[in-house]
């Protein structure tokens, strides 16, 4: 009995070690977004609350927590309240299979890719439930857009994943990282470049980020699926969006960019200099790079029209992935060096 309780406590501690830094990262990702986009638009960004505005995320959190939670009169109150949790929980539980370094993973399962793909797709249920439960036309339009968008881009994302599975020969995330050993030229983003780009575009669409943020298009449907949400409900949707961004960026780093592996592996004099850098630091740097690209894309591109979004998903990305899957299969059979 005591042994079982000890194991349970240890699992809870490991979960907290992952979740608490993740929530803090989400808070400061909002700060980074406002700063980066501010600099791109030749503004300063938040600079009043704390040194250089560093306490701004906590001020925003305090503001949202203290706001009144308003539940629309004709809404389904039970579903309206739990919908934000349906959106947030998948983006948190996906971290259970993320390897931060060799052997540093909560659950090293053999179907890690499948599990993570499923978790990254489940958040759309929270959006759909929120749109329907709000009993609002704008919210429902936003929810339907988001559902159609997610389903469309999941297909391209799934095909891109198949390419990685063909190349690595495993669905275990640790094995996929280890299959990229040998330096930057051995990482999968080089032979699978079209799949890498498709996966990245689909990841932006999955997380409802600009230029694919049609689910919350301010100029068309006000705030979209969370138009009726205020206070902590809105904060949870906000949290789930940014947590999903970090999860997709981590997924990209592991599948295509060597995870925790050093880019200088195989370059003797550089490898000796950077040998002391822990693996998880390289992983964090790669995640930060993808997050920066998220913000850069948001500040650069205008929002797509709905028909353009669907056309890109069905008529461009899916055919590209199918063609490159055939090419990847041929490269695997031909044992093209240095990857296969």
Curated annotation (Swiss-Prot):
Protein name (Swiss-Prot/TrEMBL): NADH-quinone oxidoreductase subunit H
Bilayer-crossing regions: 4-24, 78-98, 113-133, 151-171, 184-204, 244-264, 273-293, 316-336
One Pfam match: NADHdh
E.C. number: 7.1.1.-
Compartments, record wording: Cell inner membrane
Subunit composition and interactions: NDH-1 is composed of 14 different subunits. Subunits NuoA, H, J, K, L, M, N constitute the membrane sector of the complex.
Similarity comment: Belongs to the complex I subunit 1 family.
Reaction(s) catalysed (UniProt annotation): a quinone + NADH + 5 H(+)(in) = a quinol + NAD(+) + 4 H(+)(out)
Mode of membrane association: Multi-pass membrane protein
Main localization, broad class: membrane
Any single GO BP term: aerobic respiration
Organism: Legionella pneumophila (strain Corby)
GO molecular function: NADH dehydrogenase activity; oxidoreductase activity, acting on NAD(P)H, quinone or similar compound as acceptor; quinone binding
Any one of the GO CC terms: plasma membrane
Function as written in the Swiss-Prot or TrEMBL entry: NDH-1 shuttles electrons from NADH, via FMN and iron-sulfur (Fe-S) centers, to quinones in the respiratory chain. The immediate electron acceptor for the enzyme in this species is believed to be ubiquinone. Couples the redox reaction to proton translocation (for every two electrons transferred, four hydrogen ions are translocated across the cytoplasmic membrane), and thus conserves the redox energy in a proton gradient. This subunit may bind ubiquinone.
Keywords: Cell inner membrane, Cell membrane, Membrane, NAD, Quinone, Translocase, Transmembrane, Transmembrane helix, Ubiquinone
Record gene name: nuoH
